[in-house]
Amino acid sequence: MGEKLAIVSPKVQTTRHRIKGILTEKNYQIIFSDTPGIIEPKYKLHEKMMQAVKSALEDADLALLIVDVKENWEECDAIFSALKLRVPAIVIINKIDLSDKIKTEAAIAYFTARPYCKKAVTLSALTGINKTKFINALLEFLPEGAPFFDGDDISDLNTRFFVSELIREKIYQLAQDEIPYHTAVIIREYQEKSTLVKIVADIVVHRETQKAILIGDKGSMIKRLGMLARKDIEDFIQHKVFLELFVKVKPKWRENELYLREYGY
């Protein structure tokens, strides 16, 4: 697609929504659904996330099961087997740029032998190694049909959503421990002016102590967070941005159905 549509972070459970990415070329259109990772729900937010996974699997023509070539394959196999997929699945063995040929070939052999795996494909999402082979493998299993989206579309979600995700990404990068998992970002204002785009956003946390940490000493943390987020937002929308951030406390918002609806879950 040529755009970053999801948060990039070494922390787990960063994706909370089902995000569709649309790849349109001359002879095909592929709609990718990025979903939250599969977890045992502990609160209502987790339940919403797992509903997004279930919905994506029910709608899909093909499941892409992504595994890091250096991960524990047996653990991945257990997770993939538990999905009880009703559609064909391709196992994507990622990060081959960090592996040797012997390890990569062993991974291919291991997953090809699994009953849910119709094909195993190697890829480096970072460097683009085997990108064409990856796309061709998908086309083998996808049905023919008319395009669902216009050729210029790259996602079914709006700009405000991606702006909120870019802000949330910076929280994952800068904040420690449980704080990223206790935050939500809500865009309160998105106004296009003649010379810039004005964006006002709330960062919602559970506790006053978390608010104090995100604001930082004399506002140092929120200033840095805003500066980094603004740069990425400007790169994304290709326009100068004025970004204003507020930190608000909403105790146990992850368990509150009304808050979850308001925040887009």
Task: Give a label for each model feature.
Residues 12-14, 36-39, 69-73, 96-99, ...:
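Conserved nucleotide-binding/hydrolysis micro-motifs of P-loop NTPases
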